[in-house]
A protein has these predicted regions:
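Juxtamembrane helix-entry segments on the extracytoplasmic side of multipass membrane proteins
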Residues: 20-29, 52-58, 116, 131-155, ...
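Hydrophobic transmembrane alpha-helices of multi-pass small-molecule transport proteins
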Residues: 39, 100-101, 111-132, 150, ...
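Helix-helix packing/entry segments at the starts of transmembrane helices
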Residues: 29-30, 68, 87-93, 159-183, ...
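Transmembrane alpha-helical segments that form core, pore/gating elements
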Residues: 39, 98-100, 104, 135-194, ...
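Specific alpha-helical transmembrane segments that line the substrate/conduction pathway
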Residues: 26-37, 66-67, 72-110, 114, ...
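Specific transmembrane alpha-helical segments of multi-pass solute transporters/efflux pumps
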Residues: 7, 11-15, 40-91, 126-129, ...
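Juxtamembrane C-cap of transmembrane helices in multi-pass membrane transport proteins
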Residues: 11-22, 34, 72-82, 90, ...
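Transmembrane alpha-helices of multi-pass small-molecule transport proteins
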Residues: 21-70, 93-102, 152-159, 175-194, ...
């Protein structure tokens, strides 16, 4: 999980640099394309096959929209006015959205006072960062886009855990297929504003390559493995670690300012997220299933299949 936090936390730095060379939608398409290409090569090397069947691909495209295409585009759009460090802080709200979604779907039970307080405290921290009383203007809209991206991640994680994980497909096959689907979806958006000529910024183009291969392809596969092993809510808690990485990289590499208000908001958000992760012994779920599934694992009948359980 530490490696995933490091790779995911650096995403905001690479987006910031990539936007110096490409438009937001170009960055979105490029990272999906490079990420998909990276994982497809790994599939060839490991002899993994992509999932088959219309039903599976239907779920793949839905998950790709919520977990890849939409949040990737929102991050690129939001970071035109929001620094990489603050973007990482706002992305840390993903566990809060996952908890809200779990409550709505009935998968989160036993909302004790401390967890409810953490939920409220976390969103209070977001309000402090937004500072609507100061009239944030464009920066406020950018921050709103990033918060929406964090919420979209939560929806995507939950959908993946319910409809894709534990169906007899290797996580590498699923992550490859999902980024391939995201490439198709984001490619369709290029006529909406993603076709201006790229700027001649070598550092930005290098950042796009790193963003696509490592911060998208490898990172997304690791995310899928955690969802398979520990569930969607636990996968979302990686966001708890991202602000430290994004803030340090933003400050050291990009010399981004870090205001006292943003610092206070970050602390409030992280304390709130930490409170929501506190569980009593009775809240513990079933043991985690294996991390990966065989490429050709047989599946049981529909009545015996359980979402979130890897088919052995």
């Amino acid at each position: 999980m530490g490696l995933l936090a490091l790779l995911w936390g650096s995403t905001f730095l690479w987006i910031e640099l990539a936007l110096r060379a490409l438009s937001p939608l170009q960055v979105t398409v490029a990272r999906c394309l490079l990420g998909a290409g990276t994982l497809l090569v790994l599939c060839l090397v490991t002899r993994r096959r992509l999932p088959r069947g219309r039903a599976v691909w239907g779920h793949v495209f839905v998950a790709a929209f919520w977990c890849n295409a939409l949040p990737f585009a929102l991050f690129s759009l939001g970071q035109r006015t929001v620094g990489s460090g603050l973007a990482g802080v706002l992305n840390a709200t993903t566990p809060l959205w996952s908890m809200l979604l779990g409550l709505a779907l009935g998968t989160e039970r036993g909302l004790r006072p401390v967890r409810a307080g953490g939920l409220l405290l976390g969103f209070a921290g977001v309000v402090v960062i937004f500072a609507p009383w100061q009239g944030a203007g464009q920066a406020g809209w950018g921050a709103l886009a990033i918060v929406a991206a964090a919420a979209s991640y939560a929806v995507g994680f939950a959908y993946m855990g319910r409809h894709l994980v534990g169906r007899g497909h290797a996580t590498l096959s699923l992550s490859s297929a999902q980024l391939l689907a995201a490439t198709v979806l984001t490619g369709l958006s290029l006529p909406l504003g993603g076709r201006p000529p790229a700027h001649n910024a070598p550092a930005g183009l290098i950042a796009v390559v790193i963003l696509g291969i490592f911060a998208t392809g490898i990172t997304f596969h690791l995310t899928y493995r955690i969802i398979a092993a520990e569930g969607a809510t636990n996968a979302a808690t990686v966001g708890y670690l991202l602000p430290v990485v994004s803030l340090v990289l933003g400050f050291v590499v990009l010399d981004e300012p870090f205001s006292p208000r943003a610092a206070a908001g970050m602390v409030i958000v992280l304390v709130g997220v930490g409170m929501t992760r506190r569980r009593s012994p009775g809240d513990a779920g079933p043991p985690a299933p294996p991390v990966d599934a065989p490429a050709e694992a047989p599946t049981r009948s529909g009545s015996e299949e359980h979402p979130g359980q890897i088919v052995r």
